[in-house]
Amino acid sequence: MKQYNAIKVKHPDAILLFRVGDFYETFGEDAIKTSKILDIILTKRGAGSQSETELAGFPHHSLNNYLPKLIKAGNRVAICDQLEDPKLTKTIVKRGVTELVTPGLATIDGVLNPKANNFLASVYLGNNIGVSFLDISTGEFLIAEGSIDYVKKLLENFDPSEILISKQKKLNFLSKFNNNFQLFFLEDWVYQYDFAIESLCNHFNTKSLKGFGVEKLKDGLVSAGAIMHYLNETQHQKINHITSINRIPKDDYIWMDGFTIKNLEIFHSFSREGKSLIDVIDKTISPMGGRLLKRWVALPSKNIKLIRNRHLTVKYLIDNETALSSIQENIKEIGDLERLISKVATGKINPREVIQLKNSLAAIEPIKKLLKKSKAKSLKELSNSLDNCNQLRKLIERTLNEEAPVSILKGNSISSNFSKELEDLRGIAFSSKDFLDKMLQEQSEITGIPSLKISSNNVFGYYIEVRNTHKDKVPEQWIRKQTLVNAERYITDDLKKYESKILGAEERILKLEIEIFQGLINKMYKYIKTVQNNALIISQLDCFSSFAQTAKENSYCMPDIDES
């Protein structure tokens, strides 16, 4: 427990999932809490001794089933993994926290709502109040600064799952804002302007932030710097999908306070049977379209030109029913591009999801052609901005099997003929039946035993089974391993050599498939921004289609805008 205690003391506010063999174990108060949330058995380690402590655990392969429940219960979870192969060490296996999952930094599907962002916020109480929002599942990074009322409205509209605050400003924050949010407190030194600029410039690989148009938002940048620090502290270093930081334009939107949002039942109805505004108008098909629609409703635009452009686009889709139907059918084939490409950056994507990404990009091609033929200027502009990602699709197609499994560890993820070495190894590993049938025939002819049988188990590996009626014909060089009631089991040098060859091939196949898959992911990095842009365009198109569908169903007409 010495190793466990040394790691736990660094994460006192988190449930520590401690990898022991094939299980994640929790101890003490963590075990009591975990067993209640997950409804798993609570037992004791060292029962009756002075070191007795509560224990609860689950198989490591069930992490994605259990982790969402812990996070949804409002917990921070530190995942402590084995950092070396137990077979290669004679001492205690090295362990360390590989990820700290918090409510605001969740990338697991079971935690995330497909049609809602999951924002981590940071608030800095400076001359103004600086605030920033990051959704690590999509890469969206936003900053703003202003008065208490303005930041209150931002927090109410963006509804973050977690807010970062300086420890020294805790009471000040609580006196100004409600305490309905989940808060996490950082050391005061984290909220420094120079530290923030250095952190942000290092991440974006720039000398300044002028290119993002945020350099004047000093208090906002301080809050954003705290988010960058928090990402590093929680072991979230793979964040290439965070490609920009954008200012929230204060004057572009109508800002609604929490009271207004609640009483207009925009997102939640007062009654269980009732429907909110978003429930009524959301006809989006894709998760990312649903998220964007929610943003448009939460932050109504004041830009007259933008509003008119949206109206004309929706009118075109209403008047062109075939185009609307075709767009909707193709969007159905598109997965959550935004979150899939984020998983590429964070290294959390699996082979099946990469195939889903490829197929989603393929569905963009007919949409692009359809928009290009459109007479609506706005839709033609969207078409010009869409990228077919042909090279990326071909790369994935060459590398992965179309029926690739969820886990790379299950094997058969890599396409046949991609690697000669891999195909040769597969030939050795998967042609064992032919080889063993041939060996069986040869040994039957040599020994004169017609009823030989070759099988395997976890104890002896491969063996030859001889019925007792023929055991006097067994060659001297065969080694007896087990005596049964009606038969005896033997091994031979040739059989053991072939077994080693098969096991070696299977081990090498797995290692090679992992290497090839990781190589594919590395090659996909350069397409992140392109796919993110595609995701944004498809989201907008999905929202326009949703408005058109709602208008058709309810006989809405296009309003006139009076600027008087």
Predicted regions and their residues:
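Intracellular alpha-helical coupling/juxtamembrane segments of multi-pass membrane proteins
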Residues: 307, 330, 334, 432, ...
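Charged catalytic and DNA/RNA-contacting regions of genome-maintenance
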Residues: 1-316, 325, 329-332, 336-345, ...
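Conserved NTPase motor "head" modules and their coupling/switch loops across ABC/AAA+ ATPases, GTPases
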Residues: 473, 536-564
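Flexible, glycine/threonine-enriched loop-and-boundary segments that flank and lead into catalytic domains
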Residues: 434-454, 555
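Cytosolic, long alpha-helical scaffolding segments
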Residues: 395, 399, 462-478, 555-556
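Extended, charged coiled-coil "arm/hinge" scaffolds of SMC/Rad50-like chromosome-maintenance ATPases
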Residues: 401, 484, 488-522
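Conserved phosphate-binding elements of NTP-dependent enzyme cores
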Residues: 2-6, 13, 521, 531, ...
